[in-house]
Each structure stands twice: as structure tokens, then as C-alpha cells.
Amino acid sequence: MSAIVGLCLLSEKVVLSRSLTDEVSKLYKLNRGNVKEPRKYATERMSTQSKPVALQVPVSTIILDYKDEDFIKQNPTYSAMDIIGSPSNTAPQTAFQSIMPSLSALFNTPFIQGAFRHRVISSMGPEISYLVMVIGPPSGFMDTPMYRTVNHLSILMSNADVDLIDIIAINSTMAKSTKLVFASTFQAMLVNDVYDRCMVLVGIFLSQALPFFRNYVNVQSKGSLPPAVAACLNTPIKELFSMGSGKREPLALEFRKDNEGQCLGIVLPKGHEGDTLSSRYPAVFINESEPFSDEERSELSKLKRTDPDAYEKLYSETISKHVSDGSYGNRVIISHKMSRLSNGGVKIIGRFKISDFNTVKKNLSSRPGEVDSAKEQWEALSGNGLVTDNNTSMLHDKILDTITSNKPGVVLRDGNKKSDNIVVCFKNGFPNKKHSLLQLTKNGISVVSLDELTDAGILVESTGPDRVRRSPKALANKLSSFKGRKVTLDVDNMSTEALIQKLSTL
């Protein structure tokens, strides 16, 4: 399901009590389970009865806006700015109107721009289920401001001393006392990730993002809104998201050149056929030096011969430069050394090497001059978290497993094969304990959810133990109206290879 969500994180000590709309309540239930019951004092006297007027939101967030797939389909010409910047947000209006302009003034840019800074828009076409915006303002909010409307009571509590109603005061506080690198953080994520990310935002996630905020603020202080970002903010949603086509197509628009989000990278020494990965999956991987200009390569070549330490320093700086200007896009950077990625501002999601160096030497048989440097890189990789295999192909499979787990929704399309995918939906859910989703994907079989299935796809029902899941009315209607191919298979007693072969022949 495609949807857009805005979340505002006030602080760890903030508690928001309010009546939740049905849509927002549903979103919280997806993330955290049922919301807590109202506090005893959160009641309002209605004639002779006391009626609860507030529910305790289970995390320190305010939902600014929530639009589901139906809304997007009904309003395909709406832009991201139209949706998240709309007055229909469910947060207290005063908080929204105070915080957002302050952030906009601090960054000299529309607040939503930051969401695209973290690879929300991708040129490689992964699924994007949710656009989540998280904002962390400075300390200094009033202790217990209250907002009352006809239908609900909202209570916002913190350890602060500035009244949220006083827009001038809060703007002044933010402008004077907020370090820009702490002012805001943005991230695209799937609905099931919202809970986990909210729990670590103030800690691990925020600390990892700080170097990129510094660069972002520096760039914003020197110029105006990049044209590509401005275009992205005002581009109709229908041009940014594929909606229920049953097949995830690459996005038509390219916005990566001005996108400065944190890149992901893996460490893979020489002789491990990293070029094979980047050429076979060009939309997923990119070699660390690919964006380097001829001038940069020439300067690095000179330093490599005269000053190795200066060479490595400049190498990391060059990577950092191209991370900032978006040259790597949304692809995973393959590097020979950990230091190049970490010093270049790239998040390392995996370290890999072939367990027997003799295999590496065989891979370098046509390049004997690189064996010594390859061995140095190979020996430098050790410790917990290192993934090894003596077979190059099997090691590459482990890399792909890591990529798909760190980048939800990524579609691994073999660049050497036809792009036509078989679209399959397993009625009772994908049997992941028995079969490998990665193997199906690598063989051109895209597994989609029931609400994404079109009549061009295949519906698979298992004859094994029924893994019944609750089917909302909309999905039940989808099943009854499905006119595509249906097949019954004993998936629990088939090997993954047999399942792939069967699906490929349908």
C-alpha cells in the first residue's frame, strides 16, 4: 500500500493526549497495537455521565497528517507539499503553525524538503510505502498548554517554559538557541518500521545523521532551493509513486542529483568481483570511484605514488563530496576499505570477504600486480559482523540478502536479463519459513501483497496447512473480483527451485 504520513517528534518527555481520528488510530494500531485507555482525569461531564475525551498516544509523536492509498488515487494531482503541508493535519494547530515556519526559517527552505534529502525519491524504483517526516524542536516548551475543540481535548505536556501559543516566543527560541544539526531529521520508512525508528530517533539514528545535517545546513546557507527539489515538492503524486500496477516500474523522474541523504555502503576487498555485482545490478550497486572525474582520478594517482596517507585522506574526501552532491544516487557503494566509507560519511551495512585467500588469488589471475594490495585489504577485515564464504557466488548472494534486509522494497533486477517480471500473490501470505523471497526475486518473480495484485498477476493458494489471515472487507472484495490466473500449489512440500520453475511456466 502506498501512503504518506507526517510524524512530528517533540521530545522524549512530551505526552500528547487527544481523541484520535479513525485513520490515525488505525495507523497507531499498525505500529504499536491498541492505544492505551484514557487517564482517569481525562473525562468530561456530559449531563449525569462522565465521558472520556482523550486517549493516550503510546509514543512521543504527533501525527501531522495521514493519507492512505485511496486518498492518493482519488487525488493523483496532489503534490507532497499539498498533502503534508495541508491544513488537514491532526496535530494541534498552534503547535503545527509555530514549529513548521520556525524550521522553515532556520533552514531557509520549505520544511518538507528534508524528507527528500534522505532518499525518499529513488531513481531505481523500490517500493515506497510511507513518507515519514520527523521533527525535533529545541527545549523550552511550556509545561501544560491545553487545546480544546468541540470534539476533543488535546493536552501537550513537557518540561518547557515557552508557551506554544506564543508563536513569536517559540520562533525566537528556536532561532536563538537551536543548533541547526539538532533541529530536524527526516527518514523514509515502511509502516512497520515507524515504531522501531521512533524508539531510536533521539539516540542512534540521530547521531548517525548529524554529519549529514551539518553538510545540509552548510549547503542551504549558501544558496536557494535546488531546482530538482522544488520540482519534486510540486510534482503530482501519480508521477512519483506506482499505484497498484502489480509491477514496480522505475520512477519516471530523476531527482537524485540534488539529494544529499545518507548513502549506504559495503566493504568488499579487491579480487571479490565487486565489478560483477555493479554490472549485474547497476540500479542497486555502484563502485566507490565511479563518479570521480578525470581530474580527481589524476590527482589521486599522483598522491598514491608519493604519499599514501594523503592519498587515502583525499580519497575519503572525494567520496564525501560525491555523497553530498548526490552522484551515488540511491545505490549501495562498494568500497575496498572501511575507512573510505566511514570517513566519507557513508553508513556501512556489511563487511564481506572470501574465507580462503587462494580463491582471491585465482580471481586476480589476470591482474597479478594487485594481489599484494588485495591481501592487505583482505587481512584488514576481521571481527564480529564479518560475513564470509569460500565461494564468490555464494558470498554475492549473502550480500544481496543484506541489501534486501536493509533496503525494504528494493527490487533486484538482473541487468543481464529481461526486465519482464512474473507478478505473484500468495493468498495466505508468503511462506518465508520454507522458501527464499530473494531467490524468487532474482529469478524474475515479484511477490506482491493482495491489495497490490492486478488481473495481470497470479494468485497462489496453498493446499497445505491454512495460514489464514484476517481479510478486511476491501481485500475480500478484491478476491471475489479478481479475474487473473489462479493456481493451487502444495508450496509447503515443494523446493524453492521447483516453485520457481512452476511459476515460470504458468
From Swiss-Prot:
Subcellular location: Virion; Host cytoplasm
Keywords for the protein's UniProt record, in alphabetical order: Host cytoplasm, RNA-binding, Virion
Main location, first listed in the record: virion
GO terms of molecular function: RNA binding
Cellular component GO terms held in the UniProt record: host cell cytoplasm; virion component
Record's keyword annotation contains Ion transport: no
Family, per entry: Belongs to the phytoreovirus protein P7 family.
Annotated function: Probable component of the transcriptional machinery present in the inner capsid. Displays dsRNA binding activity and may play an important role in the sorting of viral RNA and virion assembly. Together with the RNA-directed RNA polymerase P1 and capping enzyme P5, forms an transcriptional complex positioned near the channels situated at each of the five-fold vertices of the core.
Record protein name field: Protein P7
